[in-house]
Structures are given as structure tokens and as C-alpha cells.
Amino acid sequence: LTSVVALIVGSTVGAGILALQASTAEAGILPASGTLFAIWSLLLCDALLLAEVNVALMRERDEDRLQHGRGHSSVVISLADMASATLGGEGKFAVSSLYSFMSLVVLTAYISKAAELLAPSLNLDAPTAATMFTVALGGTICFGGAKTADALNQTLTYGLLLSFALLVGSGTYYADWSQANWIGTPEAAPKTIPIIFLTLVYHDLIPVICSFLDGDMKKIRQGIVIGSSIPLAMFLCWNAVALCLAGGDPTVDPLAIISDDMGGAASLLLSGFGLAALGTSFI
């Protein structure tokens, strides 16, 4: 269960969380928080429904295998398989195409951002840093197997949570809560939906989670609820702190305020958080 929670947290929380306030500043802390919670609830229901479909197909497959004298199969029932069983061949093609395109775009963004963080620290050019990041993590996943990837993901997730807690703690210390923009322009909240929706998505992991937990719906539900609740809490905390630091001005970077007060320690903290977030998302 811990592995599933770490997988969801690591995949959901990316370096983009630190820029969340740019889209929520106009709405204010409370309207933005309400929007975050509403979208999280919708996506949670969606994830639980996907899990039900996946496990139902898994059981159908196992029943068919038992009739032919074979046991349980550990092969993951993918989103494409789910689409094929529920929407037909056209649905499978559409889902496979969209997922492949999304994966390519997201991985490219992760590698590019990782190179941006690593290149100055290692005194390398961006292409070399990008290659090192890809080979190091990709090689570990490819040759180390599932257990090694799981151990690495859990380690990076703990580092992610620790660095994030330090960032929020620093922001809380330097923030002037009397100037907090609690209720800005509630009418602006709908404009934040696309960004928040994209930030909270983790549904491509559902087939892997169902297979990893052998179709145990109780554990699957627990893993999804706990794993998605942690990023929600992180987003709510950082959004409140960031909007308080920025005074509701989307052009003000709260990280710059923290960096000015903390100096070089802030740069190390931000780099550590960014690399941990990118590493877990990549895995």
C-alpha cells in the first residue's frame, strides 16, 4: 500500500506546483481552495470507477484462464484494453493515440526541466544533462526491475515531501497573513479549472495499481484515496502560502521572496524539490 501511495504522490506532485499561484491569484485563497477540492473529488470518483472496470476485466480474464487450466495472470490490463472492452476498436485506437501523445509531451517536458536544473550545477550543457538524467533513471528502471524502481520512487518521494515541508514552513514564516487575499474575485475561479485539472491527474497509473495489488479492491480504494489526498493537502497549503506571500499579485514570485530571505539555502531547497518531483514523475 505504501508503494501505491508513493507512486500516486510522486506522479501527481510535479515542479509545476510551485507556479500554481499564478493561475489562482485572481480568484483568491478560498475560491481557489474550493475549486481544488471540487476537482479532486471529481477525479477521485473517476479513478475509483476506472479501478472498478479494470478489476472486473481482470476477474473475467482470470475466470477464462481457470476454465482452460491456467492460473492468475500478472499482465497489466492497460487503458487501451479497457477502452477496447468498453468502447470497441475505435475507442482503443483513440485512447492509445491520445495516451501516447500525452506521454511523449510530458516526458519531453520532464527531461527538459531536469536538464535546466542539472546543467548549471554540474557545469554541463543542456543536451548532456538531459541525456544523463534520462539514462540514469531510465537505466535504473530498465535493468533494476520493479523492486528497484519502487525503492527509488519511495526514496525520492520522501525527499520530495521533506523539501516541500521546508518550503511551506519557510513561506509560512515569512508570510504576512494579515495581507492574505482570502476572497479575491470568485468569478475568476472557473478559469483555474484547466490548470488544476491537469495538475491533479494520475489516472494513467490505475492499471498498474490494480495489477500491483492483485485486484484487491479494498487496498486499491485505500491507496487511491490516501495517495490523492496527500497532493491535495500539499496544493492547498502551498497555494495559501504562495498567495499570502504574493499579496494576491500573480506577477509576484513567492519563491523569489523566500530566496531573498534564505539566500543560497533556498536555491538548494528548490533544486532538490524540483529534481525529486521530476524524478518521481518520470518513474
Which positions does each model-derived feature cover?
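Alpha-helical transmembrane segments of multipass membrane proteins
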Residues: 35, 42-47, 230-238
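Juxtamembrane helix-boundary/capping and inter-helix hinge elements in multi-pass membrane proteins
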Residues: 26-30, 55-63, 73, 86-90, ...
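Helix-loop-helix junctions that connect adjacent transmembrane segments
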Residues: 124-257
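TM-loop-TM module centered on a large, flexible mid-protein loop between adjacent transmembrane helices
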Residues: 69-89, 231-279
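Hydrophobic transmembrane alpha-helices that form the core helical bundles
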Residues: 44-60, 72-124, 270-283
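Select transmembrane alpha-helical segments in multipass membrane proteins
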Residues: 1-8, 87-102, 183-194, 261-279
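Membrane-interface "cap" regions at the ends of multi-pass membrane proteins
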Residues: 1-27, 43-48, 59-67, 74-76
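The first (N-terminal) embedded transmembrane alpha-helix
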Residues: 2-19, 106, 134, 198-202, ...
